[in-house]
A protein has these predicted regions:
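Internal alpha-solenoid helical repeat scaffolds
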Residues: 1-160
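Helix-coil-helix junctions within alpha-helical repeat/solenoid scaffolds
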Residues: 7-17, 31, 125, 133-137, ...
């Protein structure tokens, strides 16, 4: 899934289905395995929110504990710093998207042991930012960041700071923007996780493009070949946005 190996993924999914249906499992084992399979399908339904919610509801009827498919520490967005970039697909559907995120969050947190807690604040904050409600967006960025810090979710911390960076830029405070760059970089470096370093590189490159500072963008982004960096599939759309901005600025 993360590396877009679709044929191999289909094969594995069919093998799991066959095992569940044909193995001599107890009722409890069958329910638990089927519930975990629903959480796997939740991941595979990315980024169709309606299907994801349905798989969560199916899993909740079968599992009496948090899922083992999605652990507390795994990043829900797999490196993407924006909930909105990943889930907004239908024109005029933003308010409905925010509503569904808030309505489904308790079920998701229960099934995943509070994985990526605060993503609903992040989405709402992005919506408010694009509607030029910058003060409200900034408040929501702080809410998302504080929740992420509480639950030790590095990816969400970076995402919340990225939202705040954009809001601060729109407010016309470049000194604060570059201060937030340093904070994003420090969090990513301290994590020791290559995924978060890639996320930080892209967030900072996105902002540098606004300031025409392409010389400060990491070379792997400028080269335009994300395959060499083994970027997860959910992060590629954001990479494309950043690379597109760089290409425009080169003209």
């Amino acid at each position: 899934f993360l590396m877009d190996e679709k044929e191999l993924l289909d094969q594995v999914v069919h093998e799991i289905e066959d095992y569940i249906e044909n193995s001599n499992l107890s009722f409890k084992e069958h329910d638990e395995l089927t519930g975990e399979f629903e959480m796997l399908k939740f991941c595979l339904a990315y980024n169709d929110l309606n299907k994801m919610i349905q798989h969560c509801q199916n899993a909740a009827r079968l599992l009496k504990r948090p899922s083992m498919i999605i652990s507390t520490g795994e990043p829900m967005m797999f490196g993407s710093p924006s909930v909105m970039f990943m889930f907004y697909k239908e024109r005029g559907g933003l308010d409905d998207l925010v509503r569904k995120m808030y309505e489904s969050r308790d079920l998701y947190y229960k099934l995943t042991g509070n994985n990526s807690r605060g993503f609903e604040y992040l989405l709402e904050g992005e919506v408010e930012m694009y509607r030029e409600h910058n003060d409200k967006a900034e408040i929501l960025s702080y809410k998302a960041y504080n929740v992420a810090r509480k639950y030790n979710h590095t990816g969400m911390e970076i995402s919340a700071l990225f939202l705040r960076t954009r809001v601060v830029m729109y407010k016309g405070n470049p000194d604060k923007v570059f201060e937030l760059f340093k904070q994003i970089r420090m969090i990513a470096d301290n994590s020791g996780h290559e995924l978060y370093k890639q996320t930080a590189d892209l967030c900072i490159a996105f902002m540098y493009s606004y300031y025409n500072q392409l010389r400060l963008v990491e070379q792997w982004i400028i080269d335009g070949n994300p395959a060499d960096m083994h970027i997860y599939t959910p992060l590629k759309p954001f990479y494309a946005i950043v690379y597109g901005r760089i290409c425009i600025d080169r003209e």
